A protein has these predicted regions:
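Conserved, non-catalytic sequence blocks in retroelement Pol enzymes and Pol-derived host proteins
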Residues: 1
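Catalytic core of Fe(II)/2-oxoglutarate
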Residues: 4, 14-97
């Protein structure tokens, strides 16, 4: 189902023609304004996570995202993607101004 990531940053590598990823800008899932992200060659999708939103004092909002099943006319075989989740070093203290 739809969810935000809890980490700092998620980088998503997808094959062209194998869409399904949708985002809902900001933390407002209630608006249901879902936007499809079409994968393209040499493009990396970057999702901001809750941790980076907190560090930025909500200046960089995390977003809800989901993967929907393809419609019959969209199906091009199995969908492959690779995600890289960037998390903070828990041994480091970050101080604000």
């Amino acid at each position: 189902g739809a969810h935000p990531d809890f980490d700092c940053l998620t980088l998503l590598f997808q094959r062209p023609g194998q869409g399904g990823l949708q985002v809902c800008p900001g933390k407002d899932r209630e608006s249901q304004q879902w936007t499809s992200i079409e994968p393209r060659e040499e493009v990396i999708t970057c999702n901001i996570g809750d941790m980076l939103m907190r560090w930025s004092d909500d200046q960089l909002p995390s977003n809800f995202h989901r993967v929907r099943n393809p419609l019959l006319h969209e199906y091009q075989g199995p969908r492959y993607s690779l995600a890289f989740f960037c998390q903070a070093n828990k041994d480091v203290e970050i101080l604000g101004p």
